[in-house]
């Protein structure tokens, strides 16, 4: 019942966008409906979540511009790497239960190389956000402020991460709202200068 109400509300919002955005949003529906099943079939459900969850970035861009160019795709790919990292961390909270019932995840796949995998995810996040900022012609303020959340990722998250400590994993996972907020405020600042 609630799913039907939410779908109806989403549809009401959706019809207010331009046709291109509506078509892109409808094209994303298979992603949204199949994501919950991914842990049964692949070790990459976090990647699938990143592709699905961050699709809103593309929709936001097209709803404003009416078109699609490489810039939002660059930020989209960076955001996918971010989700891949933070949701892998989240997955370590219940990794033992997932293994017992036969579910799959990047947390399980990379449990012996977790910090390396997370570092790689965050490295590519940084690269894509830097490239995106360059193509948006953001000035030095964007790149300077961006150092703060990137330090947070590597100094706090990677350094403090403990695969067998669910409380630390949850704390690190939740700290991603700080990362996102700083990046968001940073973009607002440079776009309004």
Identify the residue ranges that each predicted region occupies:
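Extended hydrophobic alpha-helices typical of membrane-associated regions
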Residues: 127, 131-193
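Cytosolic, membrane-interface loops and tails of multi-pass inner-membrane proteins
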Residues: 3, 87-111, 159-168
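Multi-pass membrane catalytic core of lipid/isoprenoid biosynthesis enzymes
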Residues: 1-26, 81, 100-143
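Juxtamembrane helix-entry segments on the extracytoplasmic side of multipass membrane proteins
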Residues: 66-76, 137-144
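Alpha-helical transmembrane segments of multi-pass membrane proteins
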Residues: 32-35, 78-83, 90, 149-156
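Membrane-interface module
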Residues: 73-105, 116, 192-193
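Intramembrane alpha-helical segments
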Residues: 1-74, 131, 153-163, 167, ...
